[in-house]
Amino acid sequence: MATRGGPMVAGTDGNDFEFRQRVAGTYQISLLNKSRLKYCIFFHALLFFVMLAKLTSDILDHLDIFVLEIEELEVPPPLWWEYVWAASLLTSFLGLSAARGNKVREMQKYMVAILLFAILPLFYCFAYYFSDVWEFATLDKSVELDETDIFVWRGYPYGVFWYAFCFVGFQVHGFTLYFAYNLVKAWKARTATRKFQ
């Protein structure tokens, strides 16, 4: 061993450890994608709280709780897809447990659950409000919103709010599926290497 300021051991330049200190590529990919998947789940939770804020008036109505400030907002009643999408947050626990244990099957179930409970409701929302958004996008500047069939909330087209939500939701869930797929691929490659050896 070399001492500080002392002579170097003969036969080495101090770099002989580099080839032994590398982490295998599949482990690097797994670690990177686990971190990114957790960020996506965090953003999914943030979107859930946005949806929960929208659903609060309906939930309070079902519980027979009256809050004047919330009632004054006159939030439109929710559609079924909003509750289905809000329930998609529960799938995050499946994804987190799969990531913690490197479980391929559970991660695949998580991907299917995200597709069914998060992405499909967003597609429904996209199709449901398409006519309003298209009419708003092609509207002449001389025509007032109140003169059209476009559903308006607080002076703005309601469908445009949902399109903004869908835009962010598609990005979050798309990246979630991408990172989950990369994890499944890395874990399968690692188990295939173990079986081969």
Curated annotation (Swiss-Prot):
One of its GO terms (cellular component) is endoplasmic reticulum membrane. InterPro entries: Jagunal. Residues 1-39, 100-109, 181-197 are cytoplasmic. The chain crosses the membrane at residues 40-60, 79-99, 110-130, 160-180. It is found in: Endoplasmic reticulum membrane. Belongs to the jagunal family. This is Protein jagunal. It comes from Drosophila melanogaster (Fruit fly).
